[in-house]
């Protein structure tokens, strides 16, 4: 199965339109095999497959999750849904890619994991949140960036006032990354502020039903953040390529 998927992925990358079209149709057929997801996850992990094929594999896996991971998906298509044993294998492989030294693979894996989280957390993948927080806390700057990419999609779309325990755990890590300019990239720090803004929006949306809770907890959180945010505004603007801090300043404005 894995060899078949590999060859079809190569065809999907062909510059020849007819070859590419045939390969894309063949890939759709292979998705009907319950072993497809672990096979394509293995290819994404295989360094010998080459960067282009590995990138294609993890992108295709994300699409597969939308179509075949859960009958509750808005994009669900008829076909076998992997059992929990297969899903567990695929989750582990995708999570491993968050520690890849290839930035594109890490980012694509983060998007894939965020898609899985929509259906699997907390019931089927209860440890995911703590695993991601651990990457933020103990991982290197690239791993922290990958974990932040997951939170960037996940918090905004799938967390709510029912997840205050998780938000309370996440907020200190977001602030630590935001203020650690020497340890993390501008991009990662910008995402930390963006996710902080998403968390604050979730808390604010609770005011209609838990006004006392919001009134008690929101001010101390904002007080902790306001000083470093104002300090960011006081720094000279940098506009040099990826080191530009303009996106960071924009997110700070949105957050307050």
Feature roles, as predicted:
Residues 26, 70-87, 158-171, 181-185, ...:
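HEAT/armadillo-like alpha-solenoid scaffolds in large eukaryotic assembly and transport factors
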Residues 12, 27-31, 60-68, 112-118, ...:
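Hydrophobic residues within the alpha-helices of tandem HEAT/HEAT-like
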Residues 17, 21, 37-38, 122-126, ...:
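Extended alpha-solenoid scaffolds built from HEAT/ARM-like alpha-helical repeats
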Residues 8-15, 40-49, 93-102, 132-141, ...:
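Helix-loop junctions that connect tandem helical modules in alpha-solenoid scaffolds
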Residues 1-51:
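N-terminal "cap/leader" segments of large eukaryotic alpha-helical scaffolds
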Residues 1-4, 22, 35-40, 60, ...:
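Structural recognition of alpha-solenoid helical scaffolds
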Residues 49-113:
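Eukaryotic helix-linker segments that join adjacent hydrophobic helices
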